């Protein structure tokens, strides 16, 4: 039987078990997908168990960056991004990948979001790094903003991007919220309503709540919008393919996540 899990802290409300239960059932595979609460200090011990008994695991906060030092091999893309969200176990060896970046691009394509720049990524943390990397690899001009300007400058220098003030949002054609604003306070948005552009698209990686203030205000401006669920589903589907060689239906995984959210 195939064993999978998501490791992180906290993970009690993770949507990954629901998505991967759908993936296993829809493909006729026998297996389980668990949520293992794993604080940072517990990571080395958990990975020993993964080596012994699991086909693969997903990693979420706060483990994506720390895991690199504990793996036997890390993909070049994950090394550049500096984060691993998917681990494959083969004969006791652990291989690390990042499916957040390709999952983001696949979600845009599936949702009919035009890949037109300039793209402004709000947030220079782990999620922002993956998105900025993906958009740059897709050939877009990428701008980055962060509440702490030094982080935006560091990311811009590392990836060959441009750190900009928030006011440049008016000139962007793709806005991506990769901050936690909206998650911690549903009434908050990282972008004042008057700074949204007149045309383009907006994506929020936050999916609790599903319709954040950022997305509601973008939609009110006439922008094409996408919630955080399609990227969540696509990164999960791509992870599942790395583990099994089979690609589950991302729209089915998204629907499973939506049901688990109760929306």
UniProtKB/Swiss-Prot annotation:
The keyword DNA repair does not apply. Disulfide bonds: none annotated. Shikimate binds at residues 14-16, 60, 85, 100, 207, 235. InterPro entries: Aminoacid_DH-like_N_sf, NAD(P)-bd_dom_sf, SDH_C, Shikimate_DH, Shikimate_DH-bd_N, Shikimate_DH_fam, Shikm_DH/Glu-tRNA_Rdtase. Involved in the biosynthesis of the chorismate, which leads to the biosynthesis of aromatic amino acids. Catalyzes the reversible NADPH linked reduction of 3-dehydroshikimate (DHSA) to yield shikimate (SA). HAMAP family: Shikimate_DH_AroE. Homodimer. This is Shikimate dehydrogenase (NADP(+)).
